[in-house]
Amino acid sequence: MGIKPSYIKSMGIALLEQHGKSFNGNFDDNKKVVAEITTIESKMIRNRVAGYVTRKVNTTPARR
């Protein structure tokens, strides 16, 4: 889907550092967690952050 904007990456990394145990490799589960943890009003931004977090969880060997 292309390169993510820096604000998506920084928000995703911050969420993983603070609430890493809450996330898993499932996008739908991560959407709900991002909605609960953050105050992001935009559905599109929330989904992009959840997608970035899901991708990080699935591709980072230590998180598997």
UniProtKB/Swiss-Prot annotation:
Alphabetically list the UniProt keywords: Ribonucleoprotein, Ribosomal protein
Tell me the PROSITE patterns matching this sequence: RIBOSOMAL_S17E
Q: What InterPro entries does the record point to? A: Ribosomal_eS17, Ribosomal_eS17_CS, Ribosomal_eS17_sf
Keyword flag RNA-binding: no
Task: Show the Pfam families listed in the entry.
Answer: Ribosomal_S17e
Q: Point out the signal peptide segment.
A: none
GO process terms (BP): translation
Is this entry keyworded Ribonucleoprotein?
A: yes
Question: Mind listing the GO molecular function terms for this protein?
Answer: structural constituent of ribosome
Where is it found, in Gene Ontology cellular component terms? ribonucleoprotein complex; ribosome
Q: Which family does it belong to?
A: Belongs to the eukaryotic ribosomal protein eS17 family.
UniProt-listed NCBIfam families: PRK01151.1
HAMAP family given in the database record: Ribosomal_eS17
According to UniProt, the name of this protein is Small ribosomal subunit protein eS17
